[in-house]
């Protein structure tokens, strides 16, 4: 059960003390307090952990400071979409809103190469009105002999250039606790010119200790990709690890499943789960068409597979697109064959916008018929 307190509740007040004293007297019930501090208000939630079936919602709602009460199911307790759940399905970071009603495009380099490539990519994004990007500094690879990223050496110039070209958020994968500290230090040294969304890749979806560590910090939001060899339920519970440790600013990423049933694409496209994840949880849903398709193959109509798939999923309500571009794919250190060209960026963005408008029209249509 979750007690949602009135906004800006003073935790030093007598009424709050009265509430906590009452909760402390509940046998077999433990409490966990979570606070979200926004620009205009502070929101406090108290999680009651244990056998709460005997607790009456009306009685709990009548307690001091309590504005609403949510009875949660066993699964996805924090991030789940429960009955009569008024909690928001969005969050803001660095002035960018991430929610189940928004769409953000994160185009960029799968792996950071030289500084010129980074600058060319970021300049193109700025010139096309974008404020988010992807930049891979740490690259987990299947082969121990493959390039594994420039690591902390590239962070200063990536962050400096991101600030120069107005990037508000960079999606960046980490694979170890030390990477989190390196990102913090590099941001501090460069004057924090941009923000970072930490990315947990498919290989680390069940690295539970890493999930706990990332979940305990709340300065960076998290993009968690679905594990490529596990069920959707297992991946959603991985996201719950993050949230249960305190970080609720989580985006769930679909990137295709590893199976030969996806041939000739790199992975089997699992984007039909976009509406499923939105129905089960309050997380925004990201799709990664580049790592699903893995090639620049085109249909007879001339449209690239990666663009067809992106459009299909945006029309189904996806909230974030993580896509590979590169100024010179032949020189890319990772995944060059699947990267789109910088000159294709305006075309890609316009195609995404067409798909988004189609989705909004579909929602409008549903609402109109629901009223009739």
Model-derived features: where do they sit?
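Alpha-helix-loop-beta-strand connector modules within alpha/beta enzyme cores
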Residues: 147-172, 214-221, 271-287, 338-359
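Non-catalytic terminal accessory/regulatory regions of metabolic enzymes
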Residues: 1-106
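Hydrophobic faces of well-ordered beta-strands that scaffold small-molecule active sites
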Residues: 103-109, 131-135, 169-172, 196-200, ...
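Glycine-rich, proline-tolerant flexible connector loops at the mouths of alpha/beta enzymes
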Residues: 134-153, 325-336
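Catalytic alpha/beta core domains of metabolic enzymes, predominantly
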Residues: 93, 206-325
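N-terminal small/glycine-rich loop or linker at the start of catalytic domains
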Residues: 91-110, 141, 282-295
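N-terminal active-site wall of soluble small-molecule enzyme domains
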Residues: 140-195, 207-209
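Active-site mouth loops of central-metabolism enzymes
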Residues: 103-120, 143-149, 169-174, 199-202, ...
């Amino acid at each position: 059960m979750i007690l949602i307190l009135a906004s800006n509740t003073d935790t030093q007040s007598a009424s709050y003390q009265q509430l906590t004293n009452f909760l402390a007297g509940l046998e077999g019930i433990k409490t966990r307090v979570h606070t979200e501090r926004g620009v205009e208000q502070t929101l406090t939630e108290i999680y009651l952990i244990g056998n709460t079936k005997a607790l009456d919602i009306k009685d709990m709602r009548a307690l001091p400071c309590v504005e609403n009460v949510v009875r949660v199911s066993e699964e996805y307790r924090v991030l789940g979409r429960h009955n009569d759940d008024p909690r928001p399905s969005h969050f803001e970071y660095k002035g960018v809103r991430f929610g189940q009603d928004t769409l953000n495009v994160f185009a960029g380099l799968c792996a950071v190469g030289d500084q010129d490539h980074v600058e060319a990519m970021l300049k193109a994004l700025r010139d096309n009105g974008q404020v988010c990007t992807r930049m891979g500094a740490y690259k987990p690879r299947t082969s121990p002999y493959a390039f594994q990223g420039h690591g902390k050496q590239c962070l200063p110039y990536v962050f400096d250039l991101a600030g120069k070209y107005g990037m508000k958020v960079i999606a960046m994968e980490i694979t170890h606790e030390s990477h989190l500290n390196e990102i913090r230090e590099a941001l501090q040294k460069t004057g924090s010119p941009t923000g970072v969304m930490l990315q947990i890749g498919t290989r680390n979806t069940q690295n539970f200790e890493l999930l706990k560590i990332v979940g305990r910090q709340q300065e960076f939001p998290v993009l968690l990709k679905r594990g490529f060899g596990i069920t959707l339920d297992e991946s959603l519970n991985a996201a719950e690890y993050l949230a249960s440790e305190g970080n609720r600013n989580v985006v769930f990423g679909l990137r295709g499943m590893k199976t030969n049933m996806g041939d000739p694409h790199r992975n089997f496209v699992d984007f039909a789960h976009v509406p499923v994840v939105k129905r089960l949880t309050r997380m925004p849903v990201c799709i990664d068409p580049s790592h699903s398709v893995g090639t620049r193959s085109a249909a007879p109509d001339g449209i690239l597979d990666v663009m067809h798939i992106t459009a299909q999923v945006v029309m189904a309500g996806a909230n974030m697109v993580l896509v590979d571009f590169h100024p010179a794919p032949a020189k890319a250190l990772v995944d060059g064959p699947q990267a789109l060209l910088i000159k294709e960026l305006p075309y890609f963005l316009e195609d995404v916008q067409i798909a988004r408008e189609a989705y909004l029209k579909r929602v409008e249509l549903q609402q109109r018929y629901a009223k009739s």
